């Protein structure tokens, strides 16, 4: 009854785990009505968790990866109870795997965006992720070398290891969009640059979940990210950084941002 009451449900990935708790309780108690409630909640939340491009809503690449794992498990549990995974969920989950492959650095590690640790990307998240996780030994490369995700990521890379080792490719990721909160930082407008086998511009990434920790507070701020600062101009901390133009050809990847 507690999990069925909407007022007890929180947000984001915490809500996902509550819904899964309801799935398990419903299965044990053979309560089909409660199971259907959990199913409807999962379907509704998934539409906001991953958009049609496959971008996650938490503002951190590490949480993009974790949500792929959590939701794959969630839909597997739903299937085990005899329910069908919604077609849109299948499509968005696959798009999310491809999006993660684009975001991962050429050396196979996660870019430190938002609350993300500097770790290798996990295998087993689809053929595109396996490709970057194994330096091209398994899986297959995604199509294209540049993409702009509406949820605030521009990704540009020199290639997928066809003319040189994958780890020697260049990679740039730029953040834009509105203030996401959740596990994001004040990093809109920041630039991440990897080339010649190493990261040259990187951000603070995950430090701690302790909200009163002054070091964590600093690592969330614009000052801890690769953002152009103009001291003489006023800036609104939570203002949107909009993508004014994005063009990708075989020769040029071009983007223009407007920091309000």
At which residue positions do the language-model features occur?
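Short, solvent-exposed loop/turn segments at secondary-structure junctions
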Residues: 10, 161, 179, 207, ...
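Alpha-helix N-cap/helix-initiation motif
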Residues: 11, 56-60, 182, 210, ...
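Catalytic-loop motifs flanking and including active-site residues across diverse enzymes
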Residues: 18, 67-70, 224
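Active-site rim segments in enzyme catalytic domains, especially the processed small/beta chain
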Residues: 184, 188-255
